Amino acid sequence: ILPHKATAKVDSRLPPGLDPDEALQKIRAFLDDQGYADIEIRKLGGYPASQTSVESPAVQAAISVFAKYASDINVQPRIAGSAPFYQFTERLGLPLVPTGMGFGTGAHAPNEIMLIEPGDDIAAAGLADIEKAYVDFVYALADAE
């Protein structure tokens, strides 16, 4: 027995420069071209991507500060998650540096964890060092501007 309908929720992470409405139009055009004009699309939300240059004084300040506290610095121009970061970078013209330092897992899950004090076998910062690093970052950012 086949159901009379099927539904799917699709989350698209857009690159900088691609407008959410334009992306939706491209998806609609692709489905139509493939013979799926009968598929209904309901837009539930959306916002533009955001990116701050790795050369930005804010990013360089974060890298220099976090290097004091963590042995492995991983710079990612974009993150896999989504948030309306464009409000800062596009509308306000401010650099945004989404950062994380230390060891954690299970983000946004009931079993999300963060280490208070990592063991010697973990090359990551614990809670106290993370707090110190964020204070140092604010000072480094003030000096960089």
Set out the residue ranges of the language-model regions:
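Midchain, well-structured core segments that form catalytic/ion-binding scaffolds
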Residues: 1-18
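Active-site lining segments that contact anionic ligands and/or coordinate catalytic metals
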Residues: 5-9, 36-38, 83, 91-96
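Short amphipathic alpha-helices in soluble, non-transmembrane regions
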Residues: 23-31
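A short beta-alpha structural unit
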Residues: 11-16, 40-55, 78-80
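Flexible, glycine/charged-enriched surface loops at secondary-structure junctions
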Residues: 36-42, 144-145
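His/Asp/Glu-rich mid-to-C-terminal helical/loop segments that flank catalytic regions of hydrolases
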Residues: 26, 71-73, 101-145
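Hydrophobic, well-ordered secondary-structure elements that form the walls
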Residues: 10, 62, 88, 115, ...
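Active-site-adjacent substrate-binding region
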Residues: 53-96, 100
